[in-house]
A protein has these predicted regions:
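Regulatory hinge/linker segments at domain boundaries
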Residues: 1-24
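Hydrophobic patch in the ABC ATPase nucleotide-binding domain
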Residues: 14, 58, 73-74
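Short, locally clustered residues in the helix-turn-helix/winged-helix DNA-binding domain
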Residues: 23-27, 69
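Recognition helix of helix-turn-helix DNA-binding domains
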Residues: 28-63
């Protein structure tokens, strides 16, 4: 995955780290794989995932991935 720097976008209500996690989710990575890639704990990834789902008002990872693709994050 290319290392993209998330730029603040008022239409995307996520932190830079949440955006990174969402990109990884959209590529189909597991929580463990995301944690290893971003050098954070699996528990931190889980927290970010829950925050992402809440902030973008979706109920699962698949819907979050679709949301990310539609906004050009992936």
């Amino acid at each position: 995955m290319a290392n993209r720097v998330a730029t603040p976008d008022p239409d995307i209500p996520l932190t830079q780290r949440e955006t990174q996690v969402l990109r990884h989710m959209a590529l189909g990575l597991s929580n463990k794989e995301i944690a290893q890639s971003l050098t954070i704990s699996v528990e931190t990834v889980k927290e970010h995932v829950q925050n992402i789902l809440r902030k973008i008002a979706v109920t699962d990872r698949t819907q979050a991935a679709v949301w990310a693709v539609r906004r050009g994050l992936v």
